């Protein structure tokens, strides 16, 4: 699996509870742009609208080498493909538990098909973010000490 775009900010702002794989409906020029690494998921999020799941606010830049007559919107909502039971489960978690859905990555699977890694997440507050940073620093110091010792 080759990651084409990652949402590193989501890992910082949310605690991930469960991840799902979803197909993405794209135009041909968007696929070429994704393979060229011209995507950004920084402020993107996932919503369920009328029983369908959409990736919103994901930025896929236009590639200059593709057809110039048709230029898709760079921040257009992109439909995600999931099984009905998965969508219903996500909808229940979002409405009852107050969780959010976030796009973590766009990647190529083993069959060279572009997929989205969608996560069910809970927002972190400032205290949680600081705690995560402290744990990360402590782990780095422990690794450095182990390296010196060995």
From Swiss-Prot:
A molecular-function term among this protein's GO annotations: RNA binding
Entry GO terms, CC: cytosol
PROSITE patterns, per the entry: SSRP
Annotated compartments: Cytoplasm
Highest taxon of source: Bacteria
One BP term from GO: trans-translation
Sorted UniProt keywords: Cytoplasm, RNA-binding
Function field: Required for rescue of stalled ribosomes mediated by trans-translation. Binds to transfer-messenger RNA (tmRNA), required for stable association of tmRNA with ribosomes. tmRNA and SmpB together mimic tRNA shape, replacing the anticodon stem-loop with SmpB. tmRNA is encoded by the ssrA gene; the 2 termini fold to resemble tRNA(Ala) and it encodes a 'tag peptide', a short internal open reading frame. During trans-translation Ala-aminoacylated tmRNA acts like a tRNA, entering the A-site of stalled ribosomes, displacing the stalled mRNA.
Protein name: SsrA-binding protein
